[in-house]
A protein has these predicted regions:
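Glycine/small-residue-rich loop that forms an oxyanion/phosphate-binding "nest" at active or ligand-binding sites
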Residues: 1
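Short acidic-hydrophobic surface loop/beta-edge motif
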Residues: 4-12, 109-111
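Short, flexible, glycine/charge-rich loop motifs used to bind or transfer phosphoryl groups or to couple energy/partner
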Residues: 5-6, 49-54, 87-90
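Active-site metal-binding loops of divalent metal-dependent hydrolases
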Residues: 6, 19-22, 67-68, 102-104, ...
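Alpha-helix C-terminal capping segments
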Residues: 9, 56-57, 91-94
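Active-site-proximal loop/helix segment associated with metal-binding centers of metalloenzymes
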Residues: 11-79
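A short C-terminal boundary segment appended to hydrolase-like catalytic domains
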Residues: 45, 137-156
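Conserved beta-sheet core of the metallophosphoesterase superfamily
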Residues: 70-138
Length: 156
């Protein structure tokens, strides 16, 4: 299972999942129905991620989060949120190859952050049948599925 703030290993690649988002339109949403307080990252989540990174010499291959951090927001012309600044604490500490996020409903490479919407990316595999798609399905030979870019891995 992918647990926010913990480094996991899959197919020989290390990756970190962070539950990071802020509903920028929550004034128009209803708490517990269309937005949830627990979608916001906490200081405990950040501390857990930094400790987990330190146990791996701050090196991971991939970081997955919903939003992209302050730099991505600025590059896209958006005002960064509290969660973006929190994510930066991890992105600025980690030595990583690629950061994947969604949220913006576009496909774009912003430095080391890859925003996914329609793109299909091959990661962590030499097997052409292993892929990640924008609907959040992570297809592996054992039918393990990643239901959302930020979600948890479940075995079907």
């Amino acid at each position: 299972n992918a647990i926010t703030g913990e480094v996991s290993t899959l197919r020989g690649k290390k990756w970190l999942v962070l539950n990071v988002t802020d509903s920028h339109d929550k004034a128009f949403r209803k708490e517990g129905i269309s937005w949830w307080e627990q979608e916001r990252i906490t200081q405990d989540d950040i501390n857990k991620a930094l400790i987990s990174l330190a146990q791996h010499n701050d090196k991971v291959d991939f970081i997955f989060s919903h939003t992209g951090g302050t730099e991505v927001n600025r590059m896209l012309g958006f005002k960064p949120t509290h969660s973006d600044f929190m994510l930066d604490l991890v992105l600025n500490t980690a030595d990583y190859d690629q950061h994947f996020c969604g949220h913006y409903h576009i496909d774009k490479l912003c430095d080391k952050s890859r925003i996914l919407y329609d793109d299909i990316m091959l990661i962590a595999s030499s097997d052409e049948n292993d892929w990640i798609d924008i609907d959040g399905v992570f297809n592996i030979t054992e039918d393990i599925k990643l239901k959302r870019l930020m979600g948890e891995i479940i075995n079907d």
